[in-house]
Amino acid sequence: DDFLCAGGCL
């Protein structure tokens, strides 16, 4: 998971 995108980046 990516904390900058809450796991929702493309």
UniProtKB/Swiss-Prot annotation:
<dbReference type="GO" id="GO:0031640">
    <property type="term" value="P:killing of cells of another organism"/>
</dbReference>
<dbReference type="GO" id="GO:0050832">
    <property type="term" value="P:defense response to fungus"/>
</dbReference>
<keyword id="KW-0929">Antimicrobial</keyword>
<dbReference type="GO" id="GO:0050829">
    <property type="term" value="P:defense response to Gram-negative bacterium"/>
</dbReference>
<keyword id="KW-0044">Antibiotic</keyword>
<keyword id="KW-0295">Fungicide</keyword>
<comment type="function">
    <text>Has antifungal activity against M.arachidicola with an IC(50) of 1.3 uM, but not against F.oxysporum. Has antibacterial activity against the Gram-negative bacterium P.fluorescens. No antibacterial activity against the Gram-positive bacteria B.subtilis, B.cereus and B.megaterium, or against the Gram-negative bacterium E.coli. Has antiproliferative activity towards L1210 leukemia cells with an IC(50) of 8.33 uM, but lacks antiproliferative activity towards HepG2 hepatoma cells. Lacks mitogenic towards murine splenocytes.</text>
</comment>
<protein>
    <recommendedName>
        <fullName>Alliumin</fullName>
    </recommendedName>
</protein>
